[in-house]
Swiss-Prot record:
Superkingdom per UniProt: Bacteria
Protein's organism: Salmonella typhimurium (strain LT2 / SGSC1412 / ATCC 700720)
Name of the protein this chain belongs to: Membrane-bound lytic murein transglycosylase C
Record HAMAP family: MltC
Enzyme Commission number, as recorded: 4.2.2.n1
Cited function: Murein-degrading enzyme. May play a role in recycling of muropeptides during cell elongation and/or cell division.
Localization of this protein: Cell outer membrane
Pfam families xrefs: Mltc_N, SLT
GO MF annotation, one: peptidoglycan lytic transglycosylase activity
Residues lipid-modified (S-diacylglycerol cysteine): 17
Catalysed reaction, written as an equation: Exolytic cleavage of the (1->4)-beta-glycosidic linkage between N-acetylmuramic acid (MurNAc) and N-acetylglucosamine (GlcNAc) residues in peptidoglycan, from either the reducing or the non-reducing ends of the peptidoglycan chains, with concomitant formation of a 1,6-anhydrobond in the MurNAc residue
């Protein structure tokens, strides 16, 4: 669950792909303007939620959390892709079960097009799809997957009769229903993107297992993934850093649009292209492929410059130092001495996930 407790100003000179830091060695005025605008938007959005739900109940979408508000911010649907749960809640003072029923049905039947849903407003723009995103990830009370509105409605009525809960936030009563995803929900989501991953792998020469491991760690295969740093989509690509770098390398001007990065195929292509750039350009001076892979993984989160500076402020000397070490020593140093705790954990998580995909 992502509770917005504070909105930090993001430093424009840091470099990364998916975390709160950004790639790019030079000051990017356009990026700063966009980031400041995004911070203002998030602040207003969080304030609207806090006024109704209370400070401790502020819940906002994140990389592994789909959160959508409707009914003038009185109702919300939250899919926690890490925990494998769907929680639908309302603070509506009149007919709360009717609000829950409608939200449950729409959540179960929503499609997988992130461009059609604004997660930072209360507009009810969720469209019922003939191919629901959650199809196969949720089973109803009879053990059946849910594709059609009739089955979703029947299941919603069952949930309201058997699983309705309530609590007080000190201001209002919150009514909620929680639904568990199937145990292998992660694999079911991953399976949707295997073809796209395979295509990007062949195009850029990046191991499929690494792409999948990055996707799992970044978003848990949530195509709606967003972040406080405005990283977008399955591989959490930032428009004005990794996105811009990839576009420049491909001879394109400008930066990829939000809609472009919310398209799964485009997101996977861009994220994989950036992995290839890290491997073949920014960190190409590292000779051992395993050591270089550790550096690439860490750099995807915290930037290539920060990886090299762990060893030396001089990039060439840093590469030479790494080349004199065993891969195990490189891994040990990156997971214990990198200045960012997030990046230290990131290498461990991605490396572990990649091993699991290699065994399949």
């Amino acid at each position: 669950m992502k509770k917005l407790l504070a909105l930090a100003v993001i430093a424009p000179l840091l470099i990364s792909c998916s975390s709160s830091t950004k790639k790019g060695e030079t000051y990017n005025e356009a990026w700063v303007k966009d980031t400041n605008g995004f911070d203002i938007l998030m602040g207003q959005f969080a304030n609207n939620i806090e006024n109704l739900w209370g400070y401790k109940e502020v819940l906002i979408a994140g990389p592994k959390d789909y959160v959508k508000y409707t009914d003038q911010f009185q109702t919300r649907s939250h899919i926690n892709f890490d925990d494998g749960t769907i929680t639908v809640e309302t603070i509506a003072g009149t007919e709360p079960t009717a609000h829950l029923r409608r939200a449950i049905i729409k959540t179960l039947l929503m499609g997988d097009d992130p461009t059609s849903v604004d997660l930072y407003s209360d507009v009810d723009d969720i469209k019922i799809s003939k191919e629901p995103f959650l199809y196969g990830q949720v089973l109803d009370n009879t053990g059946q997957p849910i594709r059609w509105e009739g089955r979703a409605t029947t299941f919603a009525d069952y949930l309201l009769k058997t699983r309705l809960k309530s609590r007080s936030n000190g201001l209002r009563i919150i009514y909620s229903v929680t639904i568990n995803l199937v145990p292998n929900h992660l694999d079911k989501r991953a399976h949707k993107y295997i073809g796209m991953v395979r295509q990007a792998s062949r195009k850029y020469g990046v191991d499929e297992s690494l792409i999948l491991a990055i996707m799992q760690t970044e978003s848990s295969f949530n195509p709606y993934a967003v972040s406080h740093a405005d990283a977008l989509g399955l591989m959490q690509v930032v428009q004005h850093s990794a996105g811009k770098d990839v576009f420049r390398s491909q001879g394109k001007s400008g930066t990829p649009s939000r809609n472009f990065l919310f398209d799964p195929a485009s997101n996977i292509d861009t994220g994989t292209a950036y992995l290839a750039m890290l491997n073949n350009v920014y960190l190409s001076g590292i000779e051992n492929p395993t050591s270089r892979r550790y550096a690439v993984i860490t750099a995807y989160n915290g930037g290539a410059g920060s990886v090299l500076r762990v060893f030396s402020n001089d990039k060439i000397q840093a590469a030479n130092m790494i080349n004199r070490m065993s891969p195990g020593d490189v891994y040990q140093i990156l997971t214990t001495r990198h200045p960012s705790a997030e990046s230290r954990r990131y290498l461990y998580k991605v490396n572990s996930a990649q091993r699991s995909y290699r065994r399949r």
